[in-house]
C-alpha cells in the first residue's frame, strides 16, 4: 500500500540552504537530518521567512517521501526532533562578521570571537497521538535558509526526495558536496578536492585527546572501497545524479593527495522513484579486479551483533 503525501511536494521539489550550513547538516544523525530537510521543503528560498512561522511535519509524509515504514518514521520524527533541537551551527572568521551585519550582532572585525554557536531551532514539539512534529526556526538561522536567490551568498540546492532517501552518512554528505558544486557552477561537471578536505566534508574524522583532528581510513584503498564506492553506489541508485566517478589528480610521493570527481546530474530522470531492490556498483574491469584482490587481502569488517 502506498502512503499518501499530504505535503505540497513532488519528486522535483528542492531544498536550499547557504553553504555555511553544509558542515552542520553533514554532521547531523540521519533522523535529525530528515526532520531538517522536511522543515526546509515548504520554505520559499527567494523570500524572507515569515516571522513566527511554525512548520508541521507528519510522520506519514516522512514515511512516503523517504520510503521507510510508518513505524520507523514515527520513531525518527521523535528522535530527530530531539537531536535537531540540541544542534547548533558554528561560525568562524568572516562568517561571523557577515552574520553580525545582517542581524545587528555586537561583533566587528576588531572584536570578533574565535567561534560563534547558533541554535537552529527555537522550540520543537512532538504530538505522538496525531503523528506530527511542530518546530520554529530561530531568528539567527533565517539568513541561511531564506532570501537566498539573487544575493551574492552561495547556496546548495538538493532534491528533497533524494536527500531523504539516502541512508548512509557518507552517501548523504557526498551527495550534498556534489550538489554544492553543481549549484554554484552549473557549467562545470567536475571538482578537484584534497583527500583530507574530502574526509572533512564527509565527516570521516575524529579528534584525539588533545583536540587534534584524526582522519579515518588512512589507507586510501580501504577509504575507496568502504566509503567512496559504497556512497557512489547509493547516490546513483537513489538520486538524480546518474553518474559519479573519480580519478587520482595529484600525489605527494606515493600518497594520493587530491582527487578529481566528475558527475552528471539529470533531474528529468530522477532514479529515486524506483523500487528498492538490491543494487550493485558499476565498476570498470580494472576496478573490479583490484577490489577482488584487495578484498581477499583485507576482508571488510563484519558488523557486530
From Swiss-Prot:
A Pfam family the protein falls into: Rep3_N
Keywords assigned by UniProt, alphabetized: DNA replication, Plasmid
Superkingdom of this protein's organism: Bacteria
GO biological process, one term: DNA replication initiation
One GO MF term attached to the UniProt entry: DNA-directed DNA polymerase activity
Record carries keyword Coiled coil: no
Additional information: The expression of PI protein is autoregulated. PI protein binds to direct repeated sequences within ori-gamma region for replication.
Physiological role: Initiation for plasmid R6K DNA replication.
Quaternary structure (record): Homodimer.
Family listed: Belongs to the initiator RepB protein family.
Protein name, entry field: PI protein
Originating species: Escherichia coli
Amino acid at each position: 500500500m502506498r502512503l499518501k503525501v499530504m505535503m505540497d511536494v513532488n519528486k522535483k521539489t528542492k531544498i536550499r540552504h547557504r553553504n555555511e550550513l553544509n558542515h552542520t547538516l553533514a554532521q547531523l544523525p540521519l533522523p535529525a537530518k530528515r526532520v531538517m530537510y522536511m522543515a526546509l521543503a515548504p520554505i520559499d528560498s527567494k523570500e524572507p521567512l515569515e516571522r513566527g512561522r511554525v512548520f508541521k511535519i507528519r510522520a506519514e509524509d516522512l514515511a512516503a517521501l523517504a520510503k521507510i515504514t510508518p513505524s520507523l518514521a514515527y520513531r525518527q520524527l521523535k528522535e530527530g526532533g530531539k537531536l535537531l533541537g540540541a544542534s547548533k551551527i558554528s561560525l568562524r572568521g568572516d562568517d561571523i562578521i557577515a552574520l553580525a551585519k545582517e542581524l545587528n550582532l555586537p561583533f566587528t572585525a576588531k572584536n570578533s570571537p574565535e567561534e560563534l554557536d547558533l541554535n537552529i531551532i527555537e522550540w520543537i514539539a512532538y504530538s505522538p497521538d496525531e503523528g506530527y512534529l511542530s518546530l520554529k526556526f530561530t531568528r539567527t538561522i533565517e539568513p541561511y535558509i531564506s532570501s537566498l536567490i539573487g544575493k551574492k551568498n552561495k547556496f546548495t540546492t538538493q532534491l528533497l526526495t533524494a536527500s531523504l532517501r539516502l541512508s548512509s552518512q557518507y552517501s548523504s554528505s557526498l551527495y550534498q558536496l556534489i550538489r554544492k558544486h553543481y549549484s554554484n557552477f552549473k557549467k562545470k561537471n567536475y571538482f578537484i578536492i584534497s583527500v583530507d578536505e574530502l574526509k572533512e566534508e564527509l565527516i570521516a574524522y575524529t579528534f584525539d585527546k588533545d583536540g587534534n583532528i584524526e582522519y579515518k581510513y588512512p589507507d586510501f584503498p580501504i577509504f575507496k572501497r568502504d566509503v567512496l564506492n559504497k556512497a557512489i553506489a547509493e547516490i546513483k541508485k537513489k538520486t538524480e545524479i546518474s553518474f559519479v566517478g573519480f580519478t587520482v589528480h595529484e600525489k605527494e610521493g606515493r600518497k594520493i593527495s587530491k582527487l578529481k570527481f566528475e558527475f552528471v546530474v539529470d533531474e528529468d530522470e530522477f532514479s529515486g522513484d524506483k523500487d528498492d531492490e538490491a543494487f550493485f556498483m558499476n565498476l570498470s574491469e580494472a576496478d573490479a579486479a583490484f577490489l577482488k584482490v584487495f578484498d581477499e587481502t583485507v576482508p571488510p569488517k563484519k558488523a557486530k551483533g
